[in-house]
Amino acid sequence: MSRLFGTDGVRGIANTELTAELAYNLGRAGAYVLTEGTHKPKILVAKDTRISGDMLEAALVAGILSVGAEAVCLGVVPTPAVAHLTRVYGADAGVMISASHNPVEYNGIKFFDDKGYKLSDDLEDEIQRVIESGFENVPSPTGANLGREIIEKAALEDYISFAKDTIGISLEGLRVALDCANGASHEAAVRAFRELGAEIFVINDNPDGTNINENCGSTHPEELMEYVVKKKCHMGFAFDGDADRCLAVDEQGNLVDGDFILTICAKYLKELGRLKDDTLVVTVMSNLGLMIACKNEKINTAVTKVGDRYVLEEMLAKGYSLGGEQSGHIIFLDHNSTGDGLVTALQVASIVKRTGKSLFELKNVMKVLPQVLVNAKVPNNMKNIHEEDEEIIAEIKKMEAALDGCGRVLIRPSGTEPLVRVMLEGENQAEIDEMAHNLAKMIEAKCN
């Protein structure tokens, strides 16, 4: 059997790929692997607003109860709430049922350990091994030893209180627009900003089970960009379906992506002496403009592979406090163990409030360099040709010399398709367009 777990848990089309049977098996195996067995284990379970969440929750909970563990159901809350509450409630593990920014027909199951971190590959593989073994040696308790389902009504309240406490300042006087993606932030974000005194204007906060992420939220911020200007707001925030990521919009309707948010927050935290080792953790896909801005502000950058799990690994290994991705996955490790959209939005709003500067002014710390991405079709067995072919290597060096430190060439093989992605950044859009297309053609020609 191929690997069940992807980069962010188990994901697939609900009821055909991610079936109730698979959810039951994951609940049963996960509860067995993630608990010590010396006490009655407690596992938190939450979901986003997808229609398939109820079906998968029922099956997952049944699996958890079948090995004698307690399932504590939190209802609809953001993914980062599960990470936070797993620690606060002293649970053995947490599970989120969500497919994040994906369309409604998809769903996913993601586990957190007792410290609120996503599982290691080894633990995920062990869960899969237990399922594939037919649950060999996994107990099937009876009578009083079966597990119980507990409904935790205070979960949302507890998470909102935590998020508000991360800024310690009133947001009175700020006009803030929120796009909740008809997802898990539709109560948490609205209540947090309102309770902190902001005047809020909300769109896409009416989930019906089928409209999550539908032309809204962080993957479609266009409506919010217009709405912020129309309502004369100081800023806006767009969340994805499970609210582990967030993008911002300034008062002029410009998108403020994860690179801008990271740079703004890093600069502010450094000034307060709260940016560990004056270092920001980013991925190779962050715009070169971020690197230049950080250099100007005397902020070090640690660069990882693409994926928030690699950002987190680097942060934990070195003790860094801030990291994230252009997509809006921002990790404030002093506050939470995973990307947290609401915490991110509140940090940005509090910086605007404390500095007295507009978001447009704050984002001027960084200038985005033009970026172009071209796909080159290559056979799966030739995805490293750019590292092996002498002519291609020479051409890349020539391009980098022409960009003269004000641009870069990055080639990334796709993990799922027979292609490599040729990315160039530089000051001249027309120049890098031509370079990228020429390099992609050269790579394709060498493969044929």
Swiss-Prot record:
Catalytic activity: alpha-D-glucosamine 1-phosphate = D-glucosamine 6-phosphate
Superkingdom of origin organism: Bacteria
Entry keyword Transcription: no
Cofactor note: Binds 1 Mg(2+) ion per subunit.
Entry keywords, A to Z: Isomerase, Magnesium, Metal-binding, Phosphoprotein
Posttranslational modification: Activated by phosphorylation.
CC per GO annotation: cytosol
GO molecular function: magnesium ion binding; phosphoglucosamine mutase activity; phosphomannomutase activity
Binding positions (Mg(2+)): 100, 240, 242, 244
Keyword match Calcium: no
Cofactor(s) recorded in Swiss-Prot or TrEMBL: Mg(2+)
UniProt GO BP: carbohydrate metabolic process; peptidoglycan biosynthetic process; UDP-N-acetylglucosamine biosynthetic process
Chain positions with Phosphoserine modification: 100
Function: Catalyzes the conversion of glucosamine-6-phosphate to glucosamine-1-phosphate.
Entry's family note: Belongs to the phosphohexose mutase family.
Protein name: Phosphoglucosamine mutase
Organism: Clostridium perfringens (strain 13 / Type A)
